[in-house]
Amino acid sequence: MHYTIIDMEKDPRCGQFAYFRAMQYPFASVTVEVDITDMMTARGSRPFFLSLLYAVVRAANAVPQLRRRILPDGRVAEYDWCPPSYTAMKPDGVYVYCTVEGDMPYGTFIAEGQRRQREVLERGTLTEDGDVRSFFFVSSVPWVHYSQLQPPAESPDDSNPRISWGKYVTVN
């Protein structure tokens, strides 16, 4: 994945970056409810999870700061595009990681996502493929309606955004 090094000394958020970087637990999270009525209609017979994943990853990539990662040498890189790495559940209830690389049209993304899921469900593991630092880590817990999930982070320098959602509900 291609990225550009950001000069944090000249970045308008330099102070905030330094402040949070010095913390032992520098992570912040936000929980929002999203109306997916239009998406449910527009997706037709296409898979719900991959349709929502496509929309979420497009939205996250539209925010440059969400594409920024801290490199091992402490520099900050802004990726041109960040793909999702998400969990897929095998028939035995064990989950594995699946990745769909690249910025692509909706129909292509759905087909590629289905292909990759078949592949990882046959032989997948908890090992990530590709440039792990570029990923958005995505989890879905579709049998539980929840308002927050706090996924684990490897270290304080782990700067991959985590995105999750639970069971969707109908609200009148």
Task: Describe the residue ranges of each PLM region.
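Helical lid/core segments from catalytic subdomains that handle acyl or acyl-like groups
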Residues: K90-Q148
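Small-residue-rich loop/turn and linker elements
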Residues: L66-T99, E128
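Acyl-group handling in specialized metabolite and lipid biosynthesis
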Residues: A28-G44, Y95-T108
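Short, solvent-exposed polar/charged micro-motifs at secondary-structure junctions
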Residues: M40-T41, A77-W81, Y146-Q150
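Flexible, Gly/Pro-enriched loop and linker segments at secondary-structure and domain junctions
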Residues: M1-E33, F49, F135-S139, V144-N172
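Long, contiguous hydrophobic alpha-helical segments, chiefly transmembrane helices and signal peptides
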Residues: V30-V32, L53, A60, L66, ...
